[in-house]
Curated annotation (Swiss-Prot):
Binding site for FAD: G15, A16, G17, H18, A19, G20, V127, S182, Q371
GO molecular function: flavin adenine dinucleotide binding
HAMAP family, per the entry: MnmG_GidA
Region (Disordered), start-end ranges: 203-226
Subcellular location field: Cytoplasm
Name of protein: tRNA uridine 5-carboxymethylaminomethyl modification enzyme MnmG
Residues annotated to bind NAD(+): 274-288
Function summary: NAD-binding protein involved in the addition of a carboxymethylaminomethyl (cmnm) group at the wobble position (U34) of certain tRNAs, forming tRNA-cmnm(5)s(2)U34.
The keyword Transmembrane helix belongs to this UniProt entry's keyword annotation: no
Family the UniProt entry places it in: Belongs to the MnmG family.
Species, as recorded: Listeria monocytogenes serovar 1/2a (strain ATCC BAA-679 / EGD-e)
GO CC annotations on file: cytosol
Gene: mnmG
Ranges of compositional bias, category Basic and acidic residues: 215-226
């Protein structure tokens, strides 16, 4: 095919899903001339699976993206149809916001946001190959022969990467939602020497709302006072739609059991590794055979569509079996299936082939982000896309990459897990993966990351000023409560008795009273007058910081200990073969991962404390040898 020079850019982003849009917006907003290429312009930021954003750990990631200057939180706040805060009865470390999105509004709003950016060119095109010169990525070549040149390239092709859809015995080449897949780029990555693996994910059928008998289901409304994902959002949308809860039953399970021989999950048809934390209904029936029923949530896909997402019923069983099992579920006896559920297999680049900046080790100037790195979920993809976009732009401007620590953000935990440990299955972010989850809360994402966002140019001066004012207000109110003494008046004693708290014998500092589990900031505010107005956001922060002060201090001490290990850098040109005493597995893993610090090396599976001790001694001896010379 004849090729032609189609233009030169600073950064090219291949793909415009949830990773691609964050990568492109970050790069463009940082001043890099950015080209975003996508197979279909109508699929920008499309939600091929569940129409929701957030949830445990994932909701915190959305807040972190926003605190750094990304778009997902803002876009969700503009387009949600339901907002709920989860785990409100638990501690602040596991609270999480989850939105039901209008998937069509979400997509259109995000596309228009990109179109308005001066530094971004959004174009339809299918990338087949990369332009590589002397191990450096210099651009991309499309199937129409267009050659686009750039200083860095970010690949965010997601499940389009050599995608194959499977429904029962039917199997065909396709991206999600029957879109054109990206086949030749995967083949090209293999030619370049990248290790790819087949992963699998799935989606449930969509059904017609007007054929559902909602009287047989349980209503799941949104919060009366919804919270925002973005720290920029001032007004919340109040016109919310409910979701609905129903259950499978033994009849449903019998139909599934009778057709397991036709499910790709249990035949040789399925080659890809599926997501452990998002199992298909077939998998659930087999793995949890003692359970008489499983939850099914009916989630509207938008305000202007009849389509309802059947959450909890992900399946790749044949079409007629899907229809039959749907109609055994209470409320769905006469339901019409509008779209069939399916499994999709796709290529993933094994993420231990990446640096923590998300640049590939094999090809300089080439970054990958999103599901192509072996993750599952829109939020995980968006977090990676943001960091890849930031670092691709910073490489153009000859600046050091931004690498978030495990103590700074869930995004840091996610990327460190991927590049240090790799993954054998689609990776899902969980609160249990974070050692310092009390520090990585939903409520304090801005306090952790706004400084970085402003420094790299994604947070405006105006927003940064508001952030500094909030910080000052929190400190001022904490100081006030630490100085204000509450006397054991009749009014105070009555209030304490009413809520089951012990009465005061002497006076007590307001901050010390707030440390009691049953005492909230609102209760303190009732008995301690305030000269200035304190917003709910500031009140929440003051309460958490005072109430959990001891635990937070303990976590910070652990972080300091870990940072001392992070500060012990491993020389770039280290020869692991020259280190005697390392276990064979440790030697292989260290050579493959090429950790940047002793802390990262210690997190590699197969590298034991004894190996770390040997490595430390070797590095120290190397320093001594250099000094003596």
């Amino acid at each position: 095919m004849q090729t032609y020079d189609a233009g030169t850019f600073d950064v090219i982003v291949v793909g415009a899903g949830h990773a691609g849009v964050e990568a492109g917006l970050a790069s463009g907003r940082m001043g890099a001339k950015t080209l975003m290429l996508t197979i279909n312009l109508d699929m920008v930021a499309f939600m091929p699976c569940n129409p929701s954003v957030g949830g445990p750990a994932k909701g915190v990631v959305v807040r972190e993206i926003d605190a750094l200057g990304g778009e997902m939180g803002r876009n969700t706040d503009k387009t949600y149809i339901q907002m709920r805060m989860l785990n409100t009865g638990k501690g602040p470390a596991v609270r999480a916001l989850r939105a039901q999105a209008d998937k069509w509004d979400y997509q259109h709003e995000m596309k228009h946001t990109i179109e308005k950016e001066e530094n971004i060119t959004l174009r339809q095109g299918l990338v087949d190959r990369l332009v590589i010169e002397d191990g450096v990525c210099k651009g991309v070549i499309t199937n129409s022969g267009a050659i686009y040149y750039a200083k860095t390239v970010v690949i965010t092709t997601g499940t389009f990467s050599r995608g194959e859809i499977i429904v029962g015995e039917l199997r065909y080449s396709s991206g999600p939602n029957n879109q054109q897949p990206s086949v030749k780029l995967s083949e090209h990555l293999e030619e370049l020497g990248f290790e790819l693996r087949r992963f699998k994910t799935g989606t449930p059928p969509r059904v017609k709302s007007s054929t559902i008998d909602y009287s047989k289901t349980e209503e799941q409304p949104g919060d009366d006072h919804p919270r925002a994902f973005s720290f920029d959002t001032v007004e919340m949308l109040l016109d919310q739609l409910p979701c609905w809860l129903t259950y499978t039953n033994e009849t449903t399970h019998e139909i599934i059991q009778a057709n397991l021989h036709r499910s790709p999950m249990f035949t040789a048809t399925k080659k890809g590794t599926g997501a452990r934390y998002c199992p298909s209904i077939e998998d659930k029936i087999v793995r949890f055979s003692d359970k008489p029923r499983h939850q099914i949530f009916l989630e509207p896909e938008g305000k202007n569509t009849e389509e309802v997402y059947v959450q909890g019923l992900s399946t790749s069983l044949p079409e007629e079996v899907q229809r039959e099992m749907l109609r055994t579920i209470p409320g769905l006896e006469n339901v019409e299936m509008m779209r069939v559920g399916y499994a999709i297999e796709y290529d993933a680049v094994m993420p231990d082939q990446l640096w923590p900046s998300l640049e590939t080790k094999l090809v300089e100037g080439l970054f990958t982000a999103g599901q192509i790195n072996g993750t599952s979920g829109y939020e995980e993809a968006a977090g990676q896309g943001l960091m890849a976009g930031i670092n691709a732009a910073r490489k153009v401007f000859e600046k050091e990459p931004v690498i978030l620590g495990r103590d700074q953000a869930y995004i840091g935990v996610l990327i460190d897990d991927l590049v240090t440990k790799g993954t054998e299955e689609p990776y899902r972010l969980l609160t249990s993966r974070a050692e310092y989850r009390l520090l990585l809360r939903h409520d304090n994402a801005d306090l952790r990351l706004t400084e970085i966002g402003h420094e790299i140019g994604l947070i405006s001066d105006e927003r940064y000023e508001r952030f500094l004012a909030k910080q000052s207000a929190i400190e001022a109110e904490k100081e006030r409560l630490q100085k204000t003494r509450i006397k054991p008046t009749a009014e105070v004693q009555a209030m304490l008795k009413e809520i089951g708290s012990g009465e005061l014998k002497d006076g007590i500092l307001a901050a010390d009273l707030l440390r009691r589990p049953e005492i909230t900031y609102d209760k303190i505010a009732q008995i301690v007058s305030r000269e200035t107005f304190v917003t709910d956001e500031i009140a929440e922060q003051v309460e958490i910081q005072i109430k959990y002060e001891g635990y937070i201090q303990k976590s910070n001490l652990q972080v300091e200990k870990m940072k001392r290990m992070e500060d012990k850098k491993i020389p770039e040109n280290i020869d692991y073969d020259a280190i005697s005493g390392l276990a064979t597995e440790a030697l292989e893993k260290l050579k493959k991962i090429e950790p940047l610090s002793i802390a990262q090396a210690s997190r590699i599976s197969g590298v034991n404390p004894a190996d770390i001790s040997i490595l430390l001694v070797y590095i120290e001896q190397g320093k001594i040898a250099k000094i003596s010379k």
